[in-house]
Amino acid sequence: NSRHQWWIEQGISKERLELDKVKDEDLSHYSKSTIDIIYNFPHGKEELEGIANRTDFDLGSHTKNQNEFEISSKVISNKDSTTKLVIQNLENKKWFVPYVIEPSAGVERGVLALLNEAYFEDEKNSRLVLKLKPHLSPIKAAVIPLKRNNDELVNKAKLLKKELQKIGLGRVMLENSGNIG
């Protein structure tokens, strides 16, 4: 499942993810099949995303001249439609209403799951670390001169920051509020 893989690529551990096929009796009236992507939070399991096969219900409901096409869903006649939402099969030249696959994810749960995965307690150095995947990190690099009161080092750090920005690295931060060396 490509959506399952997408969550893993964002930083979600595959061991904490489950795919759950929704039982037929629990499906929405328009759905032929729905798969939920479940995340195992510390407080329990919750759905991150649902992926529904909505069949031809959506496009069939909104297409013009519905009776000209074999629509598998039970749709109400739509006399106001001005467009035929159909595709032609190039092999047999028949027109058909395509199915819609609808992924539906909540931002809040997704972000919470990502933060849960990225949160790390570095006990050796007594600090908390947020280990985001590089493509999610708002800051791609930090340039930190060893001494803030050394003009030569600070100027070189500023130059390095500009060079990193020029190559398109992303957001680069210059941190010179204290000494690290």
Spans of model-derived segments:
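NTP/phosphate- and nucleic-acid-binding module
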Residues: 1-181
